[in-house]
């Protein structure tokens, strides 16, 4: 992977401001271990070890102690964490564990070795903490789980992984709801604090998706829809960056590139690129675009991504970006790569490719192909390919779109399809398209009404020559309507 990948690992492991500030506060409040010992809540062995551990100030001293007493360290941390109920003390232990792992990633092994002897998994001690009420405790536990899973010698699997990924999805979706104003903030957590906690969750996901096996598990858990939901909502640029970073990581896998075709990612990312004022957001979108074109093994997949980028006016954006100066040479390299690849795709672009790409983007406009008699004569039957894939998209747009232009163009295209494909009427009826077009005959927008009416006429009529004369007589009115 690239050097940017390494930077990403550092980014993801660094805590957000609120967690860093709270952790500093927690470290400063030393625990009176002696009182726990006197109350018989902890063993003398654990009390003695934790007090010695706290006295090791330098990383070298701590490392030496962990090399000789790693097993005791894991045992003590877990004993204290599970036997003490006071929130402040649990926070303190979790902070110690997180600091210990952050200083040296290889230290995750002490927890794996200890868990193995107890016939447990390293994360089994921390997963239950995700249900606690205190936000700092929950998010520290989440960070520790991600580090164990990403840096450890064993993979998290099965119900543990499902549980953790579902927790991440729930947290990210709650951010989506907050952003759209569906839920009100409750308790004492401010909106700003809450968004920082969500950034911490996104950081956990970034760490996890660096491991190829977890990418597949995340996609199977419907994680891509979760990411797209956050990106489609107005979220802060930091969370935006983290979500796109996650998409970029997914796209390192050729199989993932194949799978991600169905999510319509390119239009969402190109919209963000157009509005982006942060260099790091621009950089990660370009890197994701590059992965889609570079890591996809199938030529058809590469072409589909390239066409989607062309359809979403990415070429124009790249030309504008090329004029700017960047400190990061990765950006310039990615711009050059993308301009070259998209330029090649434009050369190979057939009118059917153009139409197919526009339709898949869901952003229909009155581009020349829609009005081209030659296009429909040559390509109407091709809308039946891949089990009517394009026709299904067309009818779906008639059902779900609220954009008058999209509805007008879609209705027009249904009409042209049935006019040029002999068995088209029956196909459209089977897909529910006839009823959908009829529903728009009373639409508030004049263009939608007009094109729906024409499409219905084409669905009903048997004498094309007669209809042709009728349409010619109506043309001056439509021209006036458009002006």
From Swiss-Prot:
- MF annotations from Gene Ontology: proton-transporting ATPase activity, rotational mechanism
UniProt KW Methyltransferase keyword: no
Q: Gene3D superfamilies in the record, alphabetically?
A: Leucine-rich Repeat Variant, V-type ATPase, subunit H, C-terminal domain
Phosphoserine is found on: 483
Recorded coiled-coil stretches: none
The record's subcellular locations are: Cytoplasmic vesicle, Clathrin-coated vesicle membrane
For biological process, the GO terms are: endocytosis; pH reduction; proton transmembrane transport
Task: Give the UniProt tissue specificity note.
Answer: Expressed in brain (at protein level).
Q: Which UniProt keywords apply?
A: Cytoplasmic vesicle, Hydrogen ion transport, Ion transport, Membrane, Phosphoprotein, Transport
Taken from the UniProt entry, a GO cellular component term is: clathrin-coated vesicle membrane
Membrane topology listed for this record: Peripheral membrane protein
Per the record, the similarity remark reads: Belongs to the V-ATPase H subunit family.
Q: What quaternary structure, including any partners, is listed in this protein's UniProt entry?
A: V-ATPase is a heteromultimeric enzyme made up of two complexes: the ATP-hydrolytic V1 complex and the proton translocation V0 complex. The V1 complex consists of three catalytic AB heterodimers that form a heterohexamer, three peripheral stalks each consisting of EG heterodimers, one central rotor including subunits D and F, and the regulatory subunits C and H. The proton translocation complex V0 consists of the proton transport subunit a, a ring of proteolipid subunits c9c'', rotary subunit d, subunits e and f, and the accessory subunits ATP6AP1/Ac45 and ATP6AP2/PRR. Interacts with AP2M1.
**Role:** Subunit of the V1 complex of vacuolar(H+)-ATPase (V-ATPase), a multisubunit enzyme composed of a peripheral complex (V1) that hydrolyzes ATP and a membrane integral complex (V0) that translocates protons. V-ATPase is responsible for acidifying and maintaining the pH of intracellular compartments and in some cell types, is targeted to the plasma membrane, where it is responsible for acidifying the extracellular environment. Subunit H is essential for V-ATPase activity, but not for the assembly of the complex.
* Protein name according to UniProt: V-type proton ATPase subunit H
Organism the protein comes from: Bos taurus
């Amino acid at each position: 992977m690239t050097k940017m990948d390494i930077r990403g690992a550092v980014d993801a492991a660094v805590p957000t401001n609120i967690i860093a500030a709270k952790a500093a506060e927690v470290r400063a409040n030393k625990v009176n271990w002696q009182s726990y010992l006197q109350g018989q809540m902890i063993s003398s062995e654990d009390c003695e070890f934790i007090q010695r551990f706290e006295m090791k100030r330098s990383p070298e001293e701590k490392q030496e102690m962990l090399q000789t007493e790693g097993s005791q360290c894991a045992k003590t941390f877990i004993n204290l964490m599970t036997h003490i109920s006071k929130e402040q003390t649990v926070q303190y232990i979790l902070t110690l564990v997180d600091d210990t792992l952050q200083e040296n990633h290889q230290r995750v092994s002490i927890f794996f070795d200890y868990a193995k002897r107890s016939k447990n998994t390293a994360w089994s001690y921390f997963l239950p903490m995700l249900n606690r009420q205190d936000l700092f405790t929950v998010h520290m536990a989440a960070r520790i789980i991600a580090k164990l899973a990403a840096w450890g010698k064993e993979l998290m699997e099965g119900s543990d992984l499902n549980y953790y990924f579902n927790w991440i999805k729930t947290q990210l979706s709650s951010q989506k709801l907050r952003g759209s104003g569906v839920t009100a903030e409750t308790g004492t957590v401010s909106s700003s604090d809450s968004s920082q906690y969500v950034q911490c969750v996104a950081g956990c996901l970034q760490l996890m998706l660096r491991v190829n096996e977890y990418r597949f598990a995340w996609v199977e858990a419907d994680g891509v829809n979760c990411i797209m939901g956050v990106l489609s909502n107005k979220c802060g640029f930091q969370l935006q960056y983290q979500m796109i970073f996650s998409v970029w990581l997914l796209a390192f896998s050729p199989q993932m590139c194949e799978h991600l075709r169905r999510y319509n990612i390119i239009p969402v990312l190109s919209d963000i690129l157009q509005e982006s004022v942060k260099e790091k957001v621009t950089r990660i979108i370009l890197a994701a675009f590059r992965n889609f074109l570079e890591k996809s093994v199938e030529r058809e997949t590469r072409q589909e991504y390239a066409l989607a980028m062309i359809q979403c006016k990415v070429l124009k954006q790249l030309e504008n970006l090329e004029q700017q100066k960047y400190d990061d040479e990765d950006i310039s390299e990615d711009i050059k790569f993308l301009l070259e690849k998209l330029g090649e795709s434009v050369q190979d672009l057939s009118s059917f490719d153009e139409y197919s790409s526009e339709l898949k983007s869901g952003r229909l406009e009155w581009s020349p192909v829609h009005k081209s008699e030659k296009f429909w004569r040559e390509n109407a039957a091709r809308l039946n390919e891949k089990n009517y894939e394009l026709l299904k998209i067309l009818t779906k747009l008639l059902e779900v779109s609220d954009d008058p232009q999209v509805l007008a163009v879609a209705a027009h295209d249904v009409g042209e399809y049935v006019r040029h494909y002999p068995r088209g009427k029956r196909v459209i009826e089977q897909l529910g398209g006839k009823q959908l077009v009829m529903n728009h005959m009373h639409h508030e927008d004049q263009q939608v009404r007009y094109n729906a009416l024409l499409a219905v006429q084409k669905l009903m009529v048997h004498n094309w020559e007669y209809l042709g004369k009728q349409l010619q007589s109506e043309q001056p009115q439509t021209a006036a309507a458009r002006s």
